Amino acid sequence: MIKLSYSTFGLTNMSFLDAIDVVDKAGYSGIELSFHRDQFNPFNITEEDIANVKRKLQTAQVKAACVATASHFFTPSRPHEPSLMSLDLAGRKRRINLVKRGIEVARKLGVSLVTFGSGFIRDEHVMNPSVNPRELLMDSIHECLKEIRGDEDITLLIEPEPGMFIETIEQGMSLVDEINSPRFRLHLDMCHMYCSERDYIAALGKAAPYTRYLHVSDAQQGCNLKIVKMADDLAFDLNFANYLVYFPDTADYLLIDGDHPMYFYDDPVPPQRQTQIERILGGVNIQKTAAHVDYNRLYAGATPLDNEIFTYLISVPGLSYDVLERAKPIIAYLRGTKNADGKPFMDKMAANTLTGIVHYHEIPGEGTMDFAASFNALAENAFSGYASVELYHHVQSWEKALDDSFRHLSRYV
């Protein structure tokens, strides 16, 4: 049986106890208790806080479905960092400690599931190829599992996520098999599956036996744009995505787009770079000359697109945050500037996924996901548990998100 739940990560503009109340009143069976630096911070939680949460849950109809240890927890501008596979042991231990605190809170509240994410390959991994990130991740998971006592019914879950080291269900299932513990399983996010699996319906069915918990949100097609560092062996597939190539010697960027190639610069472009640009574009049969755009003239302030662009940029692996931050005004320019036809150069949200579906959590019913087929695939493959709506992009419109999600998803579960 699949039961609907709602994550407090989408209700962070109120007190934690109030969040439990509104989910309860909305009719959900469960609630995900998500760590948050300002709302439910495990480093600040007192025994009195735990007692108050426990008392609230005992008097409500809603049940605690899972403790989420909040990938975004530590540094707002650099979410997911440090991760369980950070090269610096101090960083890994910070994340391990957070997951262990999740297990401790779950123990005190009688919750049986605790979830986390793998983290991303970052520039530190690229610059240290002798270090195996999978080994670091596995060592960290084993360390977290030590926190679970032999007589406890607590399971640790990993959530595959677009762009992360563990991104697809195949990667997730392989990791579960290799960890080889009955206390370690999968947490599937249906939006992530839509982004990362060519046949997400079949993938849901295949992964169901490994899965103890679900996240739910909607999503839709975007403009797939890959940011990559310039290298001689780069290969481009314009049927899959457009590319924004970063040149480390000048910190310039080349947009490889068949309709409107562009070169973003802030110093005069030397002849050898112009020749290189032409060679790259010619290699993918782009005959148009790249427009030169002065980076220093790009608007770099706040825009209504900030949330969308931030979500996109933090999902790009293998590059430093400085490279990604420097790309932000470029993405804003492409999304907000109109071409000769009166349309934005990038007329859909930016995606960095395996399918072109945007990793942006939409309210169920406002995207293009097939929820009927998705839930059928899970049920037919014996999944039973909570499906928690996670809408952290809709905190300001939480009432609509809470009610519309329940109304739409109740048709299918």
Mark where each language-model region is.
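Hydrophobic faces of well-ordered beta-strands that scaffold small-molecule active sites
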Residues: I2-T8, I31-L33, A64-T69, V114-F116, ...
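Active-site beta-loop-alpha junctions enriched in small/polar residues
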Residues: S7-L11, S34-H36, T69-H72, G119-I121, ...
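Conserved, mostly hydrophobic/aromatic
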Residues: Y6, V23, I31, L57, ...
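Active-site acidic/histidine proton-transfer and metal-coordination neighborhood
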Residues: L17-D18, T59, F74-R185, L255, ...
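Acidic (Asp/Glu)-rich catalytic clusters
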Residues: I20-A26, I45-A68, E104-G110, L145-D151, ...
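Glycine-rich, proline-tolerant flexible connector loops at the mouths of alpha/beta enzymes
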Residues: S34-Q58, S118-H125
